[in-house]
Curated annotation (Swiss-Prot):
GO terms for cellular component: cytoplasm; plasma membrane. Belongs to the dihydroorotate dehydrogenase family. Type 2 subfamily. It comes from Neisseria meningitidis serogroup A / serotype 4A (strain DSM 15465 / Z2491). This is Dihydroorotate dehydrogenase (quinone). Catalyzes the conversion of dihydroorotate to orotate with quinone as electron acceptor. It is a peripheral membrane protein. Gene3D superfamilies: Aldolase class I.
Amino acid sequence: MYPLARRILFALDAEKAHHFTLDALYTVYKLGLIPVTDNRTKPVKLMGMDLPNPVGLAAGLDKNGEYIDALGALGFGFIEIGTVTPKPQPGNPQPRLFRVPEHQGIINRMGFNNHGIDTMIRNIEKSKFSGVLGINIGKNAVTPIENAADDYLICLEKAYAHASYITVNISSPNTKNLRALQGGDELSALLEALKNKQAQLASVYGKYVPLAVKIAPDLDEAQIEDIAHVVKSVEMDGIIATNTTIDKSSLGSHPLAGEQGGLSGLPVHEKSNRVLKLLADHIDGKLPIIGVGGIMEGGDAADKIRLGATAVQVYSGLIYKGPALVKECLKALAR
């Protein structure tokens, strides 16, 4: 069924197809046509949370929390929405989303297009979803990088009461200078500020919401070791490896190889797994890792668990394989 739907969707502009697919999924959900399935197939504990299974949805598919209920019916163990910023912003000019089917890849330079944290919170409040919900937070494009912490703190404070966990996105290649926050003093200062705010909010709300940080696949071992040291020293709750890559050499002479933006899907598979393994070695079990990047079949999810991830997330694989990828991953992890 999905291969036919994919042929139709791939005939459309990539961003239009994205919205059409989510709207169609929501309609099918509202009509009660998505079969109810038990997603408690492989329970696992992650950052103190009990997941029904370790296969999650990565941020980026539902930026504003508009489709939480429908996505929650697909069997995921957890869902991550966003990236969201304090204020609404349009993102980068279109076209900004490109499929590379010959390589099972996707290039995006969306630029954190979203309706803002206040709108997202209203959408969450209208949702009936009772599962594990992550909120991925970022900074507005107009905010100077030296003031980035202010944006993250605003989002953290507003999202805290509504999230199961919160992800600090400092690794998108589509917001100017954002990746500079991944290193040295900048990383320490940002994460320490967020951990201090987390402690205050835990006292206010009487609940502890874990904080994870999402990193890039384009890091060398020294940078990975530095990040591992910082996240352990500030006692982050988790780390997500990885975001999209800016390296498009795997596309060879493909016409889209020169497009700006982050590359995801199969082309990021090896780079993401390399970072995951090095990170796991340097983290030494001190905090859990969520593996994401290039999961196109069940065996890819199993590989990430074997390399040190506690849980995994999918996104681009869904575009190429459809919702059946979730069950395929769960089946592979059950072996």
